[in-house]
Structure formats: C-alpha cells, structure tokens
Amino acid sequence: MENTPFQFTLSQQRALEQLNEFVTSASSKVFILKGYAGTGKTTLVREIIRLLKEKELSIILMASTGRAAKILSNITRHAATTVHSAIYEYKDFNQNLEEIAKERQKFKMDKSGQLYLQFELSSLPESDKQHFYIIDEASMVGNEKDKSATQAFFGSGQLLDDLLHYDPKGKFLFVGDICQLPPVNEEISPALSEDYFRNRFDVLAKCAELTEIVRQDDTNDIIIASHKIRKLYANPPKTKWGKFPLRSCRNIKIFNDQASMLNNYVNRLKTDGYNKSTLICRTNKSCDAITSLIRPALGLTQPKMQKGDLLLITQNNLISGLMNGDLVEVVSVGTQKFRANLSFVHVEIKELFTQKVYSQLMIEEILYNNQTNLTQEQQKELFIDYYIRMRERGIRQKDFLFKEKMRTDIYLNALRVVFGFALTCHKSQGGEWEHVYLDIPRSFPLNPTKETYQWLYTAMTRAKTQLYISEGFWLE
C-alpha cells in the first residue's frame, strides 16, 4: 500500500487491511463495505481491483442496475455487468405456446394464465481460479420475489440467494450505502446486512465502514448536509413535522416556489442540454404532472413524442444494449407499425452517456398510458404473436432458432420507455448529475419516519455540484 498514489483516510486504510485479510482467508466468503456519500467508496474499489490484479485473481465486477454498471466501468476502467446478466440465462417459456394457440383457435378464448420467460442460473465456466465478485450499489440488491413481474422470472426469484448459489466457492464483496433506499418493496438492503447473511445463509460476513469525508468532498455542502440527514435517518426525532437542515448551504439553492425552480430547470436544460441535470419526484404521478409542464416549456408542444424529447429506458434491450435506467434523446420519429394489438413506432435515439445513436422500434402504449412496462395481457399477446410468426416459418418452440431469433426480433425487443424529464428516486439510484432539482411535496415531512430521511438522503446525493429545492416550512 506504500506505493499507492492515493492519500487514504483512516477508515479507508482500516478497510483495506481488513479486505487484504479477507482475500487471503480460506474461510471468509462475504465482505460488506459500507460507506456514506463522499467517504471514498469508489476510490477504495479502484484500489481493491488494483490489488486483486497484482495477486492475479479472477475479478468479476457487477452492479445492481445497468446505469450503475456503466458508471462503474467508466470509473474503474474494468468491464462491469449487471448481476442479472452475469448469473442468469434464458431457458424457455413457462407454458407450451402451441397448446395456448390451439386453445385460442378452437374455443376463441384463453384460460392459460400468465405467460412469461423463464431464466435459470447459468453454469459457471470451469476454472481453477477462485472468482472474486465485487457488487457495487449493493443497497439495491434485493432478495424478495417480484410479484409484479410481467415478462420474465429469474431463478428462484430471490436475487441474493441466487447470486451466492451461482458460485459456492466464490468470494463476494458488496459495496453500498445503507442510508440509500432499499430495493422496492423491501424494508432493508439485505446485501448490506451482516444480520441477514447470518440468519439467512449462516454466513459470518466481514464488514468495514467508511465514515470520514474524503478531502475533495469536505467543502461540498451537499455532502455535509447529507450527513446531517443521515443522522436523522439513524435516529428519527419524534415530531409531527420533520425539519431538514438544508439552509445556508453554498451548494444548495432554495427557490421561492416550485414554479421558479421548474423555470430554472427548463432554462438549464435549454442551456446545458440533458446530460448534466435531472429532477427527482416523490411519485410517478408527480413525475407525469411535472413532465406535462416541462415539455411545452421546452417547445415540445405535441402530445406525442417528438424530436428533442428525453426518454428513460425501463427495460434492458438486447438489440441496442441499452439498459434499464439509461436516458436517451429522440433524434427522429418515423412510421408506425401495428402488431399484437400494440402500436410500434420507429425512432432514432441518442444515448446521453455515450452520445451513440440507435435506430429501432418503440412501444407507444407504455409511453402514453403512464405505464413503465407492458401489462401481463399485452406481454402475452406479444409472445403469442412471435410464436405464430415463427410457426409460419416452420420454427417450433423447442428449436434452437426459436430462442436465437427471440434475441433479435424487432417487436419483442422494441424499446420500452417513459419520458425522462422527471424521475422517481428509485429510478435515479445508481446515477449522478451535476445539477439535481428536488420536488418535495408539502405533505412529505408530515410524521417523518426513517424512510422519509432515507428518501431525501438518496435523492440529494445524486447531485455532484448543485442541489435545487423550493422554499418550505420544513427547511432549517
């Protein structure tokens, strides 16, 4: 460690020493590296990768979302993928499509229930080396079954279970911030909990926590204020109305009202483009309402998508490689096509992070009906339509070509998007922007709980340079 170019904090040095012991220990399987905003988790991950490479160990870098994986790859200069794409592979549909098609044709009805893709744990490639897995943004790695899934089911449905079972001999380093929001519909972040590993897996997880703000962030008032919010999260005061210590901060601008804040956001989008700023809302409904104000202010006056619109990808896309959470700008809008009771439109889009342009179909119903994805019924119609098209070409469900063509079918792989001018906090997780605007509803501070402060902490730490909020009695 003497030759490293970094000046580590005391907690970083201690964590590195513990990690070195973990790497060489034959019995240790899981290490949890916790750290709040600005404590240098990413710097430490880079150093860990360097040390592991020196030891010629097999490193597999993962993140909980596609956006987080891209950011991680860029920062560490080491290839990263999502946990899902690393450990699962497509197996088959959960039902026989031919039987469903016959029933529909014979009885003019369908009682077969939900139709979805089944993904199973993929086989680990044979190797003499022990694999070392680093999972970033691990606060979003859940272990509850997703009951709202409409298109695909993965393994046992419990991601953390499956990850550990994927490589029983592997070592796992989970990196994250326990103050960030946990996975949707879960009360804690299981991958960052020593108690969870002990109770669920009988695994004694090693743990280190970064507590000191690193030198380059100790003058950033967003980081300093976020640590005050973190303390409120750790010990929520019993009060009817929460108070947020966000006043008198150089990096936090307070507007007189929401309208002034939105006007500033619109002007910044016009001046700087879409890459540097975002607006975070409490609910999807609030996102929709604010989007209806922002689009006309930007000159996007058509009710339907047009050139210059900002979109958020809501599902990983096999054709383009675009990931759930990626933001794209519409370059052009082409012709419509209709299949499976759905409307598709050809679009050219530019991914903000890489500026790369993609050309493919997009499903309109999701964008215009305030959905984030297709319903079970819509998804089923799309699957059956694909089956019929393949059957007409003599390709059956169990054929190798059936599976292969699924990966490139333009309708199955049409983009699923929503407008991206305003994001929920969960959708923003794993991302960061120079400028972040927060829409805090008046009812938000009422009877505050740990989740109240957790949401605010997660949202405000998406901002690197400047945070914007509107005036409220809850500010102090």
Task: Spell out what each predicted region is.
Residues 15-19, 27, 158-170, 178-378:
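Conserved helicase motor core of P-loop NTPases
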Residues 8, 61-62, 279:
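Conserved SAM-binding loop
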Residues 12, 65, 283, 430:
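Short, conserved phosphate/pyrophosphate- and ester-handling motifs at nucleotide-, phospho-/glycolipid
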Residues 16-17, 21-240:
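ASCE P-loop NTPase helicase motor core
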Residues 347-476:
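C-terminal accessory regions
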Residues 1-18:
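N-terminal pre-Walker A segment at the start of P-loop NTPase domains
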Residues 1-4, 38, 472:
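ASCE RecA-like P-loop NTPase motor cores
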Residues 115-128, 254-263, 400-423:
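Alpha-helix-centered segments that form part of catalytic cores
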